[in-house]
């Protein structure tokens, strides 16, 4: 609601039909979809919370430690009223130590985090709903949606398909583990001369602990887990007190994390903070228990955790090994530099031929190649047609979102899920492909509303939301900009080509 150049959100309780599952906010005792009167209204739970709060007079809210959690805390505070003393407890792991520390350091609700989340929610409603209505009008169905992040992501997937269809010639030399652009010979075998021109020993740092995007990427690549499944498993692990909060873009390691790594690694421990202290920490285990120790404790009833499956343990193992590797001494490597001559070409090939150390054993992120035979000899070659690029995986999409500044750790998975839900994309062998509907929707939006769904404009808006979080700019100024944009979308008459 706009009131004298300011904006006031209007809230209503969420209702859900127990018969058909339809969710709505309209004040009605009848389901708008199926007509059933069997309705679950959140107002009942709100009234129960109010009654409990008034009985005690004091309430501590411990929702998730991010802007969404802060907004939920703020909502609860407003619903309970001023007659109750309300404080916020923030903890990043569900362990007795972390919860005790949170209770000893209660704070007020961070209004800037709340304002930033309000901007995100309202922007999503205004722009997303306005664009979606245009889709409904043109495509004659309400099972479609659009949004600032959703549309560019769909475009990346379409572009990945395009590159996959375009081919280029490549020469493979299997014996040398080499791939050379172009066609270097018409014959199945060529003479090559390999010389060793240098070798050295060195060291490289292990990778940092997981952030949300990196966890999702590796879970898809290594465990073949869809993004949605990974986030659900991580939520379970967090709620079971086994890992820290899993929606984070920070690699920072707390003193508690350092202590856990030191206890597990012993002589292999080096210890790294991986950044400055901030509101969030990396994703890490809360105890110095590897997968097998944890599994043994659960199966022998030493530790009772309900519902832990093999998938939970596999994801835990990935998080544990990555974190412990990040706290190890550097990986020792041996590098060899070769000069390879064939026909009129000369190639220099520098490769890691060995890697050692606990970090490499825990998380082998270093690609090791075999040493090459020296001298002049004949070797086989194979000319193949390779694509200019490959279709994106779910992990690729999330990495792009992180790199391009679109979306946040809490929204990475939901964006991908929505594209599946709307039937804009399908997945084949871990690759994402657009459907005919997805391509039509993307073409319509980019041709008629290019400014509203462009990567650059979306990135700038997200930067402004971050500035609202830091208290640098007014959230109402940002909302005013979005409101003007929304009116432009509403009045535009789209064309269909």
Show where each model-derived region lies.
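Intrinsically disordered, low-complexity regulatory segments
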Residues: 1-121, 130, 384-388, 394
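Short, polar/flexible loop-turn hinges at active-site or ligand-entry regions and domain interfaces
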Residues: 63-65, 83-87, 107-114, 164-167, ...
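Core structural elements
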Residues: 120-131, 202-214, 232-243, 272-291, ...
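A glycine-rich phosphate-binding loop feature that marks nucleotide/adenosyl-phosphate handling sites
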Residues: 119-120, 140-151, 173-179, 236, ...
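Leucine-rich, amphipathic alpha-helical/linker segments
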Residues: 270-289, 452-494
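Long, highly charged, low-complexity internal segments
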Residues: 1-12, 18-21, 51, 141-239, ...
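Substrate/cofactor-recognition hotspot
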Residues: 346-363, 393, 420-423, 427-446, ...
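Accessory beta->alpha helical hairpin/"wing" motif in late/C-terminal subdomains of nucleic-acid enzymes
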Residues: 244-266, 414-450
